[in-house]
């Protein structure tokens, strides 16, 4: 498959499954939170736990077709933590604090996820390529950042373990 076709399909398979993951995880989180106050965190934790093996499979895919399939799954699961995380953050603050909570959360997500993450993958890929790994440098760079997903999962699981009641004023 030519590079321009792979790029086209990677773009499509990032946007559509990512948006679907955000939307469906929001629906699942809304349903689960009626059964348990931790329902939103369960969805975020579950999506991250499921994401890790698919990220590994994506990085190690031996064919463009498999890589594209894994890309779709990783973008679906990679977006699935977002809606429950934002909803959870809003449930932990008063209505007057929601804009600030959103600003802090989105600043962190964008600085790390959209700023540092891609830059780090690029730097690691360039370094691996310069060390003689050739085109496999990107594969190793993608694998090298997977431990950050374990950190995120551990933090979500820790948040699940906290038994703090919601703020009384956070109810609408």
Regions found by a protein language model. Give the residues of each.
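Loop-to-transmembrane helix entry
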Residues: 1-17, 42-44, 136-143
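Loop-to-transmembrane helix entry/capping segments in MFS-fold secondary transporters
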Residues: 3-5, 95-105
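Glycine-rich segments within core transmembrane alpha-helices of 12-TM secondary carriers
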Residues: 14-22, 106-118
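C-terminal transmembrane helical hairpin of 12-TM major facilitator-type secondary transporters
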Residues: 37-85
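A membrane-interface helix-boundary motif in multi-pass transporters
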Residues: 39-42, 123-147
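Multi-pass alpha-helical transporter architecture, strongest
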Residues: 52-61, 142-172
């Amino acid at each position: 498959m030519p590079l321009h076709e792979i790029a086209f399909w990677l773009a499509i398979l990032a946007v559509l499954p990512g948006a679907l993951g955000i939307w469906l995880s929001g629906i699942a989180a809304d349903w689960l939170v009626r059964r348990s106050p931790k329902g939103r965190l369960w969805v975020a934790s579950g999506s991250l736990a499921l994401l890790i093996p698919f990220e590994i499979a994506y990085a190690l895919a031996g064919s463009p077709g498999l890589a594209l399939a894994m890309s779709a799954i990783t973008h679906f699961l990679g977006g699935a933590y977002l809606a429950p995380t934002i909803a959870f953050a809003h449930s932990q603050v008063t209505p007057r604090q929601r804009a600030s909570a959103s600003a802090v959360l989105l600043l962190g997500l964008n600085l790390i996820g959209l700023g540092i993450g891609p830059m780090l993958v690029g730097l690691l890929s360039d370094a691996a390529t310069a060390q003689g790994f050739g085109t496999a440098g990107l594969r190793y760079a993608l694998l090298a950042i997977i431990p950050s997903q374990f950190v995120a999962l551990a933090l979500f699981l820790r948040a699940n373990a906290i038994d703090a009641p919601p703020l009384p004023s956070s109810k609408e």
